[in-house]
Swiss-Prot record:
GO biological process: taxis
Matches recorded under InterPro entries: ASFV_MGF360 (IPR002595)
This protein's name: Protein MGF 360-4L
Pfam families membership: ASFV_360
Length: 386
């Protein structure tokens, strides 16, 4: 049951009674639990967002209601916990972050499942992934050792690998193993970059500036050229262009990332040399399916090789030809022996840096592409060779 004090706060906040406050009022508002971050607490019924002072709902520092509840629980702010639940926050998100018995008991009184910490953790993780609740997830997991320790070590990494392999998470990490805290932060940060969730990215870049270079690397690898453009031109975050291109090429089918590095000035021939050297290309040859041998190369780095040549990389340099022979790859040799089939694509020759124009150009390239798909092309060439 909510006290008169909580109901009074609800009315005062919803009517924006503190929108015009004097500096002398700050201490009183803080003592009454009516202060949030850097100003009087505010709430938007339509957006279900908790704000501070003159902040708008779209501000990077505004809080989704469930996330605000988690913060209030961590800080043991009893009246705010009751208030946020009254507005519709899910109290189960709160109980898993309760640090004291008193706060945990309050969450149970407000309807939380006492067993949620034992039986609901995995379902919650999946829910947060499906709903793309990045900031809520970080509010729950980051610096919450009790939750991280409740995961079995093997299961924890299975959950991380369920969405991503961990290659990109360790890009700039010198130590072989990260703490769970750092790993879970990077996991959700990477998730935001992958799905182009602008508000979480901006919030996290503001809160964790030491990860700026890693953010740029991740955006390149995932082909989020909006974020590459923002980091490179608006924040002046820099990385050697050929290193950027290497990261772009490391992900099969990353046309956007590869093109953007090319447009910035990366060396295409150098990129092609690195691609041909990737061990994964040697996975191209055979796979047994129902007793028949089928070529299995669509998922390899050949698509990136194909695209680099479309951009203008020269596959017929002496160094590249020697690398191909060293690889002893029949398909690669056949592909590179057909000079009329592999050549620059006219649509890709202009260097464009505006992300919206790049998306249009790559879409046009895909629609006008006249080459065979790699699997069909390889089969055709092998048949011709025989």
């Amino acid at each position: 049951m909510n006290s008169l004090q909580v109901l009074t706060k609800k009315v005062l906040i919803e009517t924006k009674a503190f929108s015009n406050y004097h500096e002398d009022d700050i201490f009183i508002l803080q003592q009454l639990g009516l202060w949030w971050e850097n100003g009087p607490i505010g709430f938007c019924k339509q957006c279900k967002m908790v704000t501070s002072g003159s902040m708008s709902c779209s501000d990077v520092d505004s809080y989704e209601l469930d996330r605000a509840l988690v913060k209030a629980v961590k800080e043991n702010q009893t009246d705010l916990i009751k208030l946020f639940v009254l507005w519709g926050a899910d109290i189960n998100f709160g109980i898993i972050c309760a640090k004291t018995k008193q706060t945990k008991d309050l969450c149970i009184q407000l309807g939380a499942d006492p067993e949620f910490l034992d039986v609901g953790l995995y379902n919650m993780f999946v829910y947060l992934v499906k709903r793309k609740k990045v900031l809520l997830a970080i509010e729950i997991y980051y610096d919450n050792i009790s939750i991280l320790d409740s995961f079995d070590s093997h299961d924890f990494h299975v959950l991380i690998d369920f969405v991503y392999n961990r290659f990109i998470l360790y890009l700039d990490e010198k130590e072989k193993e990260m703490t769970r805290n750092t790993l879970v932060l990077r996991f959700w940060y990477k998730f935001a970059i992958d799905f182009k969730l602008t508000k979480p990215i901006r919030y996290l870049s503001k809160k964790f500036p030491h990860l700026d270079l890693w953010r740029l690397q991740t955006a390149i690898y995932l082909g989020n050229i909006d974020e590459v453009h923002h980091a490179y031109f608006q924040e002046n975050i820099r990385l050697r262009l050929n290193v950027m291109m290497f990261l772009a090429c490391a992900r099969p089918g990353n046309k956007l990332g590869i093109y953007y590095c090319f447009a910035l000035g990366a060396d295409l021939d150098h990129a092609l040399e690195r691609l041909i050297s990737f061990n994964s290309i040697n996975r191209e040859i055979n796979r047994k399916i129902s007793g028949k041998t089928r070529l299995c190369i669509e998922g390899s780095y050949l698509s990136n090789i194909y695209f680099c040549i479309g951009l203008g990389a020269n596959p017929y340099t002496k160094k590249i030809q020697e690398t191909i022979k060293q690889k002893n790859s029949n398909i690669m040799i056949l592909l590179y022996s057909k000079k009329k089939i592999l050549s620059p694509h006219s649509v890709l020759q202009n260097k464009i840096l505006d992300p919206s124009d790049v998306y249009k150009m790559i879409s046009t390239y895909k629609n006008t592409e006249s080459f065979y798909p790699f699997s069909s092309l390889a089969v055709k060439l092998i048949q011709q060779a025989k």
